[in-house]
């Protein structure tokens, strides 16, 4: 029976995707925000929503330009979608983690084929440190995601049709 399940590649891929989504998103709201970083990166978008100023990040009503504003915008969108809670505060980084694993899988598929791509996505998503960073609200995972996508796009563009 298990052999037939694996034989149907679409079912296997769907099961892997659903499992990884569950592993990342279900526990996001299970504990309070970790200080100081999660509190800081959650307060800034809360103040953006409160003031209506999405250009200048403010922390306790003082300009805060120490980090790029994209994470604050993603968190503000998450707060407006899911409400102001722990799940919403961590949603953007978890989404970046899952999409980063998918990008690693896509690059693996491009270079080595479908099986290697699936394995690379699963190994990336289930790596302990990657998972830990991907489920807390800090800037590391969005940075890693955009670097992965950018470098993968460069590689695919550079190799292009010359892939052997």
Briefly describe each language-model feature range.
Residues 2-164:
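Membrane-integral, polyisoprenol-dependent glycosyltransferases
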């Amino acid at each position: 029976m298990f052999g037939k399940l694996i034989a149907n590649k679409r079912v296997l891929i769907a099961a892997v995707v659903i499992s990884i989504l569950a592993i990342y998103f279900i526990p996001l709201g299970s504990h309070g925000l970790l200080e100081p970083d999660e509190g800081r990166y959650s307060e800034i978008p809360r103040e953006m929503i409160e003031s209506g100023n999405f250009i200048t990040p403010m922390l306790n009503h003082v300009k805060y330009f120490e980090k790029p504003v994209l994470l604050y915008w993603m968190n503000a969108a998450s707060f407006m979608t899911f409400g102001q809670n722990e799940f919403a505060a961590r949603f953007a980084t978890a989404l970046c983690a899952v999409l980063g694993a998918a990008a690693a899988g896509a690059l693996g598929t491009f270079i080595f084929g479908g099986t290697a791509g699936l394995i690379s996505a699963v190994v990336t998503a289930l790596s302990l440190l990657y998972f830990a960073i991907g489920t807390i609200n800090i800037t590391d995972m969005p940075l890693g995601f955009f670097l992965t996508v950018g470098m993968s796009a460069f590689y695919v563009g550079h190799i292009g049709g010359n892939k052997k």
